[in-house]
Amino acid sequence: MKTLLLTLLVVTIVCLDLGYTLECHNQQSSQAPTTTGCSGGETNCYKKGWRDHRGYRIERGCGCPSVKKGIEINCCTTDRCNN
């Protein structure tokens, strides 16, 4: 019985991957690359781009936000995939 419970515990930990935090780039436009650990079980990184009076702007971070028309967005699900 103890072996069965131990096996179930190990399988649960492996399947849930407890303690895993997605890592996303979070630098803006042409800044040097930086990363951040996402919180709250976030499973996406994003890269958002648009043009304004300063030129083409880029924003990166955790999540996959909704955007207005004219703003490009790319969402992805692996570590540092939004560079």
From Swiss-Prot:
Disulfide bonds: 24-45, 38-62, 64-75, 76-81
GO molecular function, one term: toxin activity
Signal peptide extent: 1-21
PROSITE patterns assigned to the protein according to its UniProt record, in alphabetical order: SNAKE_TOXIN
Localization of this protein: Secreted
Chief localisation class: secreted
Keywords, in A-Z order: Acetylcholine receptor inhibiting toxin, Disulfide bond, Ion channel impairing toxin, Neurotoxin, Postsynaptic neurotoxin, Secreted, Signal, Toxin
InterPro entries: Snake_3FTx, Snake_toxin-like_sf, Snake_toxin_con_site, Toxin_cobra-type
GO CC term, one of those recorded: extracellular region
Tissue specificity annotation: Expressed by the venom gland.
Similarity field: Belongs to the three-finger toxin family. Short-chain subfamily. Type I alpha-neurotoxin sub-subfamily.
Protein name: Alpha-neurotoxin NTX-4
Annotated source species: Naja sputatrix (Malayan spitting cobra)
Lineage: Eukaryota, Metazoa, Chordata, Craniata, Vertebrata
